Structure formats: C-alpha cells, structure tokens
C-alpha cells in the first residue's frame, strides 16, 4: 500500500523522470549503457484547461494592481497637501532673489543688488548658472502628482466596476506604457524638487553658490538665542518636514508604478497562456448555499414511493461515493461492492420517479440509471458566431469531467501494486524499465495530440478578439473554434484524457518501485 494520500494522481513532471534512475546496474552492462537525455514536455502537458484563475480576488495580479492604484491615489493627495502647504513661503523670494530689481527682503544683505548685476533669472525652470527655482520645482511636483492621481484613479475605477475593457490584454498593455511614462516623469520631478527645496544641494554647481551658502550657513550652525530670524529665508534654506515627506512619497510612487508594471506583465502572460474560459473575473455563487427546502422535498418524494422495494443498505453509499465508479461509468471491482449486491435488487424506479426540476439538479451531480451507468449533464461549448460572443455559463467555470474512483482513490494504486509488485532482482528491474519506456512514449504521443487541440483553441480565441465580428475571418475562425470545442467535448477526447492520466499514474508507480529497489541496494 502506498503512503500517498487519497487525492488526484501527481502531475507529470518531466524533470523527475531522469534516465539515470532507471539505468540498469553496472554489473549487468559493465557501465557501457548510455541513455539519450529526455526532452521536456510541451507547455500544455499539465492540463491548463483544468486550472481556473480567480482574477476577481484581491490577491490575484489584477487585484494587486487595484490595491497599488489605490495607494498611489492616497500618496498623490498627500504630496499635493505637503507641497501646497509650503507655497506660502515662496512669495518673499523667487525671481527677485537671484536676479531682479526688488531684491530679497533680508535687511542689509545686498544679495538682491548683487543678483541684478548678473541679469534676470528665469522665473520658471532654470536660470543662468544652473539655478533651480523652488517655485518651478514645486509646480512640477504638483503637476506630476495630479497626473498620477488621474491615471491611478482611471485604473482603479475601470478595474473595480469590472468593465469589459479592463479584461483585455490591450488594456494591460496600456497600463504598462502609462505606468512606465509616469514613473520616469515622477522620478525626474522628485529629483528637481529635491534640488529646489534644498538650495545647498545645487549651490556648488551654480554662479550663486557662495552667496547661497553665505545666506544659509547661519541656519546650519549653532547661533546665540534671541537673534532675529527671517522666516522666509529660513524656509528657503531648510528642508521642511512636509517637503521631506513629499520627497519620500515621490519615490514610493515610483516603486508603486514599477510594481504595477510587473503585475500587469504577469497578468498578460497568464491571459496569453490560458483560455478565456479558465479566467474568472467575477465571483461565482453556485455551490455556496444549499438548495432551499431539501428536507421537505425528500419527505414528499419518500411519501410517494412507499411501495417501492427498499434498496440494499450499501446502495446509497455506492451512489454517493464517486470512488465506486470508474471513468467508463461502471462499478469498479472493489471488494466490498460485489456485483451481486446491486444487480440483484432493482432500484431504478426511485431514480426515475424523481422530478426533473428538483433542486438537486442544481448540484449538477451524476444521475444513475438501472444498469449501473451514470449520466452527466452535457456541457455546451461557448458559441462564437455572427452575434456577439456569449458569456461563459456559470457551470462552465467548473470542471464537470469528474475525477472518478479509478483516478482519485487508491484503488488504481492497488491495481498497479498487483501488476507491478516491489522489485526483487535486476532482471525484474530491467523489465520495469522497458515497460516504463514503452508507457512513456505512449504518454508523450497521446499528450502531444491533446496539446495540439488546446493550443489551437487558445490561438483561435486570441484571433477572435482581434477580428471584426461580421468579417469573413471572424466567421471562419469561429467555425473552427466551435468545431474544436465539439472535439474537446467528445467521448473520444475524454477517453484519451483519462487514459493519459492513467498512464501518468502508472509511470509514477513504476518510478517509485525502481527508486525503492535502488535505495535498498545502496
């Protein structure tokens, strides 16, 4: 008995099947056997159609983008508040500080008259000598905060209201481009803002370096108390706490835009790899609540079927437990379910008299007939025709190809143990090795056939988004898409898929037996 828990068989991982684990002992072939390295499986070998991406969750990549955009909105408001609170101290200087006829109102310094000798400094941006105007730097910072606020608000609103535009790859490409541009501009604005609010940081490279340093040096060295301090000059030379907070928030916005780019790229890659039917943009509530009045319904049904012979005691267990049925719909040969226990007593009347509109149908459970076979609700492929593409039904979000007993419990493991018991000799190991190679080739051939259908469906799904719905290209692609969906829903496809999973379980068991034998020898 294997120690593996009762669950689905492990996914086939090519890197685990290394040839050196299955090579024969050196004492048989003298160490001269060379095995060709095994190539990796195709990208769709892990059944991507079985995986569902829950993009409505806040922890998913689109959800993280929503969170980051919300944080950018808050940080932009904080930057606007911090920068705007320091604008009042800029009215005492500006263009007249380093060039103009008025001069800075710092009594007796003569700094304004000195600046007038060098000519007029530009009031917006940069003047002579590479000097950065604080008002221009703050205006640049406020403008970028406003642009980032608008962009983040658009991203947040379009994703929260779950618009169709926000569910396309083109939308996330736009998010990447806008985030990259705004991130670069915010970085430039933050650097310019640092130079504007900290004049000593730019004084070394400007013509007014010595004058700026002489004016601001008094605030950087300890001075006697009681002296008059000009508040305008103080706020010009010293970085205020609000300005420091704005600088930090500016760099945090840059990091937030970088993270948005990362998760937008991740979202586009997932949308390219998986089919649209595998992505859930809205939360579904199918199995959250139990159907109403189930007990009352059961009582009514029981009252109407009193003269029907009672089924055997283990019949309910066999119906309720999917482990009692194999993939072809027949009962497995499990020891505690012999054929005589359920073929001797007819029970189909109970099932046939149930109303078709019963609440149990909402569960989409298999319906069993008298022969022991079961019927599963048919899945409708999403129609892609001349009209707009219909949305995927709620039931199609969930895999209706149930994993039955032959695939999910340890019955199949017991079958493999009976067919491939633990290895006791090198000759038996070689036999297992040959069976493994044969099964592996069959698995790879069968898997590649299934992969071609999945990849072709994914390619056609992307093409349908690019074509105009009434064009000939769209109609041709839609016909091919619907044909492949019918092929994928056929019994032959499901049979091959189940056989592929059984081969995967067989290869995993053989690998375990060989590994156990090699560990015992060592």
From Swiss-Prot:
Residues 88-140, 196-244 are extracellular. Its main location: membrane. Disulfide bonds join 216-237. It is found in: Cell membrane; Cell junction, Tight junction. GO terms for biological process: bicellular tight junction assembly. The chain crosses the membrane at residues 67-87, 141-161, 175-195, 245-265. Keywords: Cell junction, Cell membrane, Coiled coil, Disulfide bond, Membrane, Phosphoprotein, Tight junction, Transmembrane, Transmembrane helix. Residues 391-400 have a biased composition (Basic and acidic residues). Residues 432-488 form a coiled coil. The modification Phosphotyrosine is found at residues 368, 398, 402. The modification Phosphothreonine is found at residues 305, 403-404. Residues 367-376 have a biased composition (Polar residues). Residues 1-20, 356-407 are annotated as: Disordered. May play a role in the formation and regulation of the tight junction (TJ) paracellular permeability barrier. PANTHER family: OCCLUDIN (PTHR23288:SF4), OCCLUDIN AND RNA POLYMERASE II ELONGATION FACTOR ELL (PTHR23288). Interacts with TJP1/ZO1. Interacts with VAPA. Interacts with CLDN1, CLDN6, CLDN9, CLDN11, CLDN12 and CLDN17. Interacts with PLSCR1. Interacts with LSR, ILDR1 and ILDR2. Interacts with TJP2/ZO2. This is Occludin. It comes from Pongo abelii (Sumatran orangutan). The gene is OCLN.
